[in-house]
């Protein structure tokens, strides 16, 4: 008589958000004076948005009771947008920064993108990435 035995390894994943925070700055209107007697309103729009989220993820192998491995990762994204109007024309730029901790081979990754328009019609864009 031949007995055959087999087992199935099951890996269970669980993920739950731990912390989430938001910060938003509303636009504002400034009043400036170029010379006495003349008033001109300058619209300056500042916008800032920050999102931070922490996720705790764990993996467990049912065939090995000592295989519990908690993993924690943090994700942060910041978007800033600023517009200015001056004698040389309008100036606006937008910056977006994203950083993740606990992910990837090195455990940390960071990327930043900056773009905008300078007075005179000059456009610029900058991107950086770090692992």
From Swiss-Prot:
Note: 'fau' is an acronym for 'fly, anoxia, up-regulated'.
Record keywords: Stress response
Free-text function comment from the UniProt entry: Plays an important role in the regulation of tissue responsiveness to oxygen deprivation.
Listed Low complexity bias regions: 44-53, 98-116
Region (Disordered): 1-121
The protein's name in its UniProt record: Protein anoxia up-regulated
Induction: By anoxia.
A GO biological process held by the record: response to anoxia
Tissue-by-tissue expression: Concentrated in lamina neurons, first optic lobe neurons and cortical neurons of central brain.
Comp. bias intervals (Polar residues): 1-24
